[in-house]
């Protein structure tokens, strides 16, 4: 049984038959309906395969005369554009939250790892400090002071196993089980799931064009113990927390004795305007716990996140870290420290900003050309994902499920909401859309899915 999505299996069968001369220019191919019935698959599945073949010049659609093999075929040396990567550990098409894995400097990273291996001594083979290696904590503190305006000592930095490890440590150190927490609505799905797993009572706070609505938060639960926010680039709407609301949030935390977790999500990837200052850089009363992660900037398998905690919380977080014993591999931490200290990290981010702006443009243009009847892409100043609003009356979860069956890893906006009525849309990643042709192919697949869900035909 092939692990390929069915539409791609049909596509490849036709390509093979054309390349081997079994199907010749001008020959008719079965209608979408006939082939779907013969193969016992949905019409949209066959339609998607046919659209890809038309887009690459192998089929010609002749209206009522049907579809035929193109008279002027592309050369055989032109390989089919990969639309999906099934059966591998690589990214799925349009998968969110991933950096461009093809652009990571693997040779440089391997050299740094090798250097660390050569320096291995007895101490580096031990369990290590539960707060993280001193070298990485120093490097993080230095980077944050220089590039995010966050002044802290290495003693305030706690290295965790990814962002999930950061939230786990926060929940444990602050004894959040049964406590109330402001949570952006819509907000980061995996964070919501993890907080609920730890028994945190989430208070949904609406997000609008100015970010988290602090007045709504105070009206709903003024005495919440914690607020979790993404002020630089809200996840998933992409808006920034306005200066007035930043100040209101900090004043609320000071007045109530509450804490704010700043998830500095995607702040490094901004494509227009100046980078926004971290909320922590404005935190004169020391009520903000700053959270960052290397997973979306380097590679997800690194599983390295970090917290910068207020001075008053260092001891309680140390106790929490000792209780949890969630260490990341020392070798990876030391390699990451070298990557930061030697300037490779900032050079990599600069390169990725340029690359992501280009790849974002590929996908936005492809969606505009091929999916405008179904979607409207939100304008966002940065980030590594797109949000496209549905302009047809189709449930976004139904579209996401159908897209998943077609091999696309899009997500429904409504899945990221706590309260109903927050909008319908599709979220998708663009960082691994390497070419304009690949973006076009993906948009055609998505268009077919949308048309099928809307009960329309794209032929």
Which sequence ranges carry the predicted segments?
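Short glycine-rich anion-binding loops that position phosphate/pyrophosphate groups of nucleotides
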Residues: 99, 231-235, 296, 433
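Active-site PLP attachment segment
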Residues: 64, 281-316, 328-331
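N-terminal basic, amphipathic alpha-helical segments
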Residues: 1-116, 120, 125-129, 136-138, ...
């Amino acid at each position: 049984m092939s692990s390929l999505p069915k539409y791609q299996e049909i596509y490849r069968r036709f390509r093979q038959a054309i390349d081997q001369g079994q199907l010749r220019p001008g020959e008719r191919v079965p209608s979408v309906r006939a082939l779907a019935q013969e193969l016992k698959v949905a019409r949209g599945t066959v339609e998607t395969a046919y659209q890809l073949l038309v887009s690459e010049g192998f089929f010609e659609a002749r209206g009522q005369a049907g579809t035929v093999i193109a008279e002027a075929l592309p050369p055989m040396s032109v390989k089919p554009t990969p639309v999906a990567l099934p059966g591998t550990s690589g990214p799925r098409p349009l998968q969110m939250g991933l950096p461009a894995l093809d652009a990571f400097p693997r040779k440089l990273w391997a050299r740094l790892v090798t250097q660390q291996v050569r320096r291995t001594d007895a101490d580096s083979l031990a369990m290590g400090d539960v707060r993280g290696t001193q070298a990485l904590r120093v490097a993080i503190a230095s980077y944050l002071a220089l590039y995010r305006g966050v002044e802290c000592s290495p003693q305030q930095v706690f290295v965790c196993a990814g962002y999930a490890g950061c939230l786990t440590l926060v929940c444990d150190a602050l004894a959040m089980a049964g406590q109330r927490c402001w949570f952006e609505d819509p907000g980061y799905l995996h964070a919501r799931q993890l907080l609920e797993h730890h028994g945190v009572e989430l208070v949904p706070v609406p997000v609008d064009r100015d970010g988290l609505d602090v007045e709504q938060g105070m009206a709903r639960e003024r005495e919440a113990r914690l607020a979790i926010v993404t002020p630089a680039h809200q996840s998933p709407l992409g808006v920034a927390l306005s200066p007035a609301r930043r100040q209101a949030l900090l004043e609320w935390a000071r007045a109530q004795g509450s804490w704010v977790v700043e998830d500095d999500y995607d702040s490094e990837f901004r494509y227009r305007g100046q980078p926004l200052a971290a909320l922590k850089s404005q935190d004169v009363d020391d009520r903000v716990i700053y959270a960052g992660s290397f997973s979306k900037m380097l590679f997800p398998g690194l599983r390295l996140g970090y917290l910068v905690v207020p001075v008053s919380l260092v001891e309680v977080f140390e106790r929490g870290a000792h209780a949890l014993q969630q260490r990341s591999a020392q070798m990876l931490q030391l390699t990451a420290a070298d990557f930061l200290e030697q300037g490779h990290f900032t050079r990599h981010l600069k390169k990725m900003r340029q690359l992501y702006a280009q790849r974002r443009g590929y996908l936005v243009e492809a969606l505009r050309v091929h999916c405008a009847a179904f979607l409207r892409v939100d304008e966002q100043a940065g980030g590594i994902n797109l949000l496209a609003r549905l302009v047809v009356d189709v449930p976004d979860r139904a579209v996401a499920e159908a897209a998943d069956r077609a091999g696309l890893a899009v997500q429904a906006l409504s899945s990221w909401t706590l309260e109903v009525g927050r909008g319908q849309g599709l979220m998708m990643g663009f960082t691994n859309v390497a070419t304009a042709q690949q973006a076009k192919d993906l948009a055609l697949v998505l268009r077919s899915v949308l048309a099928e869900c809307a009960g329309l035909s794209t032929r």
